[in-house]
């Protein structure tokens, strides 16, 4: 992701999704071997031993993870895996993610940390963490919930995004804006991208 720093799995996954979509469009087989080998590593070597979730960050030689899994990165992992992994792995990761990272009170959303719930702190990727709730994790989880047809989860996440994001309306421009997006990684553009990740095959199904 950056020179001389750990490798972020979600950043790698964007590349994998791009190659996967290329193969879907052109069927050349040019990148199929690389895709297969990457996904095999993801399902075996790069899983967090404590949770079974895909790691958030790896050492530069891709041999082991450098930190505990986190809500913001895992939410993005799940949303991107929904595009390119086999259904069983994508669903299993999403179910594990929900089990470990859903925070039901005082506001429904995605927690940033498994082992702590800070009253308030700030993270460059997660944004302002309040009562342990991750703004980025909550927004990015919309993608997986939408793609996998988890409509109840999607609805509750959208309610939180609208409320906690502090939606403001510009009547002159006829637009809405998440004030939180001015200080957090995820604003309305990311939320729109995630909430419109519709898979036509799941429109009439629920997890």
Which ranges hold each PLM region?
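CBM-like carbohydrate-recognition segments
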Residues: 90-207
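Extended ligand-binding clefts on enzyme/binding-domain cores
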Residues: 2-136
């Amino acid at each position: 992701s950056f020179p001389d720093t750990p490798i972020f799995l979600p950043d790698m996954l964007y590349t994998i999704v791009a190659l996967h979509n290329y193969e879907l469009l052109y069927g050349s087989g040019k990148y199929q071997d690389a895709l297969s080998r990457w996904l095999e590593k993801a399902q075996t070597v790069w899983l967090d031993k404590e949770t079974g979730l895909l790691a958030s960050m790896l050492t530069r030689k891709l041999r082991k993870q450098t930190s505990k899994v986190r809500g913001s990165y895992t939410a993005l992992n799940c949303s991107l895996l929904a595009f390119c992994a086999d259904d069983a792995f994508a669903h299993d990761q999403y179910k594990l993610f929900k089990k470990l990272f859903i925070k039901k009170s005082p506001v429904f959303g995605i927690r940033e940390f498994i082992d702590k719930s800070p009253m308030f702190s700030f993270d460059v990727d997660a944004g302002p963490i309040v009562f342990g709730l991750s703004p980025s994790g909550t927004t990015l989880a919309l993608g997986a919930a939408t793609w996998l047809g988890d409509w109840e989860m999607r609805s509750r996440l959208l309610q939180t995004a609208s409320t906690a994001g502090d939606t403001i309306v510009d009547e002159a421009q006829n637009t809405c804006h998440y004030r939180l997006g001015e200080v957090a990684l995820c604003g309305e553009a990311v939320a729109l991208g995630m909430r419109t990740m519709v898979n036509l095959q799941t429109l009439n199904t629920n997890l």
